[in-house]
Regions:
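Phosphate-binding and adjacent anionic-ligand microenvironments
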Residues: 1-10, 14, 20, 28-37, ...
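Catalytic core segments in nucleotide and nucleic-acid processing enzymes
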Residues: 25
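Intrinsically disordered, low-complexity polyampholyte segments enriched for Lys and acidic residues
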Residues: 42-46
Length: 279
């Protein structure tokens, strides 16, 4: 679609589509709400347990999580794959950054492009009727929750036995800072639980998560389907709030894009990641 901010046509990323669909479902309500027993009054705890939850894989952007936090809605982050997302209780929407969306979890326990396309068409029709478009909605989401810019660096290997070499090296020599910002938290998912969960041996995986003082995040993990190591980068810029004007949002996006994680959207840093100099 045409992006007036960048003055060019471009394809929306999986994270951008996930944020658009997630907000739309928050605004309109779930496609097919969970059937709950309303015959007896519910305690506060029971009501909370039945409240709708939005979810995404751990390697997806944290934008949806922040939006849910702002709106007081439940959110869950899972390991990569819809076999994990489908297990989230009371999920009303779930997605992965690799273009996988579930807008009808009650009936479809997997990603489904047909229902997702229908809901996106519904959103597009509503936006056209209002005289706006998806790019402006992304700016509205940024004003509400902040700018989250994601990128990915990929290292291809010739031998599958090499897949674990990058993560092994990072375990031996973990970075103390990333892009000039101190690392404040490092998680090794072979032994640490996913954020907000308890350790479960069934959910351990070869992945490393680094969070920085600036609020940025780097995740490194071997691909589960291809001979390559993936490095997921995310930079965050706060915005003045829902009253922020378009110029303030554009400034925040430009600041994010100028940083190393944002620049990774446009450049191949495979060589630097192999040697550790990018981190």
């Amino acid at each position: 679609m045409f992006d007036p901010n960048q003055q060019r046509w471009r394809q929306l990323s999986g994270d951008e589509i996930g944020a658009l669909l997630g907000r739309h479902i928050l605004d309109r309500g779930p496609l097919r709400p969970q059937v709950l027993d309303s015959s007896t009054p519910k305690s506060t705890e029971e009501a909370a347990a039945q409240a709708p939850v939005l979810a995404n894989s751990i390697v997806s952007s944290r934008l949806l999580e922040r939006l849910c936090e702002v709106r007081g809605v439940g959110h869950a982050a899972t390991l990569t794959g819809f076999k994990w997302l489908a297990r989230v209780e009371n999920m009303s929407f779930g997605y992965e950054e690799a273009i996988g969306f579930n807008v009808d979890p009650v009936n479809v326990k997997d990603k489904d492009g047909v229902s997702a396309a229908l809901i996106f068409a519904e959103l597009a029709a509503e936006l056209k009727a209002r005289g706006t478009d998806a790019i402006e909605v992304l700016d509205e989401i940024a004003a509400e929750a902040g700018v989250f810019l994601t990128g990915q660096v990929t290292i291809r290997v010739n031998d599958l036995s090499e897949l674990g070499d990058v993560t092994a090296k990072l375990r031996q020599q973990p970075p103390s800072e990333i892009a000039g910002s101190a690392v404040t938290e490092a998680l090794d998912l072979t032994k640490d639980p996913l954020p907000g969960t308890e350790l479960d041996e069934a959910t351990t995986t070869d992945a490393l998560i680094y969070l920085t003082e600036a609020g940025d995040r780097v995740i490194v993990r071997p691909s589960g389907t291809e001979p390559k190591v993936k490095c997921y980068l995310e930079v965050v810029e706060n915005t003045p709030g829902q009253d922020a004007g378009r110029e303030a949002i554009l400034d925040a996006r430009e600041r994010a894009a100028a940083r190393p994680g944002g620049a990774a959207r446009r450049h191949d840093h495979s060589a630097e990641l192999r040697t550790g100099t990018f981190l």
